């Protein structure tokens, strides 16, 4: 296992959420990504069949002999950052969140691959670090009205594990450019590739939710709500929100978008506990 290809994105995301807003016009410097090719590639009239293919492509990191050593290393590195104080060390809250997201993890045999870290912050963020750490903010859960929305974020993060090699190559290109190597053209192509991967992870999430009998549309609406309520918080190399929603809604059968969203007892208890913490 190599150092996380998501580490630069992880640092940028957490810095953005925990330290200061990035005030930039939405879309002013957003990489252009053709949405239709992504929709054409990922559209499935049989989501369950598509998921079976992905199940064969998804590596099980916990099966690696060095898994525990690597996970410990990644956790120790994370604990040295300025973000560690925001960790919500509450076993009950962590256990309830684990119960909510478990269906997506089990589907891809990832239930024993992640150390779940709950970050206490109001900005909704989910992040997969190296396939061994999974971080979700309390804000993500607090905004959710159904398990489907939370599972949509988690499935998106699982999708990154399929594309980690492409992500690593694109990130390497950007790092070289920042050091004065490479060309503007290569830099732009790398940014476009990262934005395309994000759309593909949205498609992965949508098809996965449909295969689970969940409503992918709730995930898309969630993204639009976050964009509306947090207009000053933007990330590099992310496609526009309306493009993300178009992908989410068009890669699955229309019937999937009318599925009734579910709210489990675990999510209800989790949201209640978080509400109590906010009142303290």
What are these regions (language model features)?
Residues 1-10:
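Bacterial N-terminal signal peptides that target proteins for export
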Residues 113-132:
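Catalytic zinc-binding patch centered on the HExxH motif and its immediate surroundings
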Residues 10-17:
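Bacterial N-terminal signal peptides
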Residues 146-162:
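Short alpha-helix carrying the canonical HExxH Zn2+-binding catalytic motif
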Residues 166-190:
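Post-HEXXH active-site segment of zinc metalloproteases
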Residues 24-89, 95, 106-113, 121, ...:
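C-terminal capping/extension segments of zinc metalloprotease domains
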Residues 19-22:
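N-terminal signal peptide c-region/cleavage motif recognized by signal peptidases
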